[in-house]
Amino acid sequence: MKKTICILLVLVSLLTMALASCNDASDVSENDVSVGPQAYVPHLGETTAYQGKVLTILSSHEEHNYSKEAFSATEVTNEPINDASYNRNIKLEENYGFKIETIWEDAGNFMNRVRDDKAAGIDNYDVMVSGLQTLAFLAAEGFFLDLNSLEDSNLQLDQPWWDQPFNEDMSVAGKLYFATGDIVMLDDEYTRCILYNKDLIEDNNLESPAQLVYDHKWTLDALYEMARVASHEGDGDGKMTVTGGDVWGLVQASFESYTLILGSDCPLVSKDEDDIPRLAMMDARNVEAFEKVWEICTDRETTAYTEQWYSWNAPDAYKVCENFQKGQSLFYTITINAVSGKGLREADIRYGILPIPMYDEEQEAYCTTINPYQFHAVSIKENCKDVDFVTFALEALAWTGKEYITPEYYERTLKNKRILDDDDSAEMLDIIFSNRIADVSICYNWDDCIQYYNRIFSAGDGGLASLVESEQDQFNFEMEKTLEFFTKD
C-alpha cells in the first residue's frame, strides 16, 4: 500500500512539473518577444557596425552645472548624475563599440571657432552642442544638416526622448537644424519659472500660489494683486529703493517682461500652414497680454526690474534681484538653474517654485519659456561623413538619457535635493516642463527682436504700436533672408 502511494505521489509530482514547464514555456512565448539577451538600446538592436568609432562633440558652457555630465563624465565621483552618465558611456562602448569625446569651447567664442575651423579645413568633430541662439545663427549660415530630411538617419525625433513641441517651435519652412530632449540637461536648467517667498505669503495672509496653480487660477492678475499686497516701504525713508529695507512684490530683469507675455501663450511670431513665421505682436491677444504686463512691470511701487536702476551689465545690477535672496521680494522671475546658485543656497528664506502665470483662467494651460543663450540643443555638421553612425550614437544617447540620466537629474536631484522644504514644488516642476515655448524669432533674432519688449519697457513709453510700425519691415527682411537660404534648394 505504501509502495502504491509512493508511486502515485511520484506520478503526481512529475505531472505537476510537466504542467509548470508548459506554463513557463507559454509565459516566455507570450511575453518575451526578443530572442536572446535584449539589446542595450532596444529599438536600435544589436550591431557591431560601429566598433572603434568615436563620436566627437564640440560643446560650450563647460563650467555650467550638468553640462559635462551630459556626455563627458570620465570617472565615478559618487555624484548620481555623473555616475549614471559615466556608466552609460561605458555600456555604450561595451555594447556598440563606440566612444564619446568632447571638445570644449568658450560660449563667447563658439561661433568664431566654428567659422575659423571651416575656413582652415579643420574637420575633427561631428556634432555641435551649444545655446539655442548660437546654433540658430550658425544654421542660418549653412553649418548644419536638416534633421527632417536626413537620409540614412537613425534619429526617431517623434519619440518621447526627444522634445517634439520644441521641434515644432523651431522648424522653419519644414526645416529643423537642431533638436533637444533627454540628450542634454541644460535645456531644463535654462527653463524659466517664478520663485516665491513662503514667509511673505504667510506674513501677508495670502492664499498659497501653489494652490492657485492647482485650481487653474494662477494668472497675471493674481500675481499682481498678491505683489501689491506684499510690497511696502520698509526703511522709513519714504521711497522705494532696491538697496535699502523695502519689500518688493516682484523683482526681475527687463527681459522677463517678455517671459510674462510668453506665459500668456503669446510668442512674437505665429506660423502659418506652411510653417512660415509672421510677426504677431499686434494680434489682439498679444496686445492685451502686453498691456497687462506693462501695468505690472511699470508699477514702481510694486515691481523692480534691473534696467530701471542699472544698465544690465553694471557691476551693481545684481542688487535688484538680490532682494529676493534677502527676503525682500515676494516673487522672482528666473531660470531653474538659479536654485543651485550661491545666492539661493545661502539665503535664509523658505521659497517655492511656480510656473509662469497664465493671462487669465480661460487659458488652456500654463506656458513657460527658455533662456535662448544657454538652453542647449544638438546639431549635426553639414559635411558629416557618416550620418548613419552619428545619428545612431545621438539616438542612443537620447534614449539612454531618458532611461538612466534624466531620472537621476530630475527625480533624484532637482526634485529631492535642490528644491527643499516644499511639498508642492515637485508637482510644480512637472507643470512647468509640461508646456514649454521656444520662440523661433528670438532664436534667429531677426532684427534683434529679442530686445523689442526690453526697448519698450526701458523707454517707459508703452509704445508697442510705434515700435512694430518702425521695425516690422526690417524684421520681415531679415526673416525672409533666412527663409530664402533654407529653401534655396
Positions of the model-derived regions?
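Extracytoplasmic/periplasmic substrate-recognition and gating elements
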Residues: 343-412
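Conserved C-terminal helix/tail region of periplasmic/extracytoplasmic solute-binding proteins
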Residues: 379-391, 401-489
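Conserved N-terminal structural module of periplasmic/extracytoplasmic solute-binding proteins
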Residues: 2-141, 404, 461-489
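Short helices/loops that flank or line small-molecule/ion binding pockets
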Residues: 111-124, 136-141, 224-229, 315-332
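Hinge/lid segment of periplasmic solute-binding proteins
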Residues: 37-53, 66-68, 106-108, 133-192, ...
